[in-house]
A protein has these predicted regions:
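Conserved functional hotspots at enzyme active or ligand-binding sites that engage polyanionic ligands
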Residues: 1-112
Length: 112
């Protein structure tokens, strides 16, 4: 498969269906969190879906502004998806400040 230019910290539309139980579903924006070297080498990427339903007290969500809209990165819904599920054209990027906050949140949730 030809490598698509999916980069860490970029946001793309992703088709998450079919899903089960409480997984976030439908076609929605998702943030790529996997390393660029893996994104180039594999046919899959690691993503965190975005949602417009805000949960300010949830410690597994990071609120961001994307294209003048408030969204949350749902790190509790992190998953691996085929690149075929993503649109190649990105719809946004995290700011350096948001990237740092996301790294801290991911580390707190999964590395400690």
């Amino acid at each position: 498969m030809a490598s698509k230019p999916f980069k860490r910290s970029s946001v793309h539309w992703v088709d998450l269906d079919p899903t089960r139980r409480r997984e976030l579903k439908k076609t929605r924006p998702a943030l790529i969190v996997s390393q660029d070297a893996l994104n180039e080498a594999l046919d899959t990427v690691v993503i965190c879906p975005l949602t417009s339903t805000l949960h300010p007290t949830w410690r597994t969500r990071l609120q961001i502004g994307l294209n003048h809209n408030q969204s949350e990165i749902a790190i509790d819904q992190i998953r691996v998806v085929s690149k075929d599920r993503l649109t190649p054209r990105k719809i946004g990027d995290l700011s350096p400040k948001e990237q740092a906050a996301l790294r801290d949140l991911l580390s707190e949730a999964y590395a400690q």
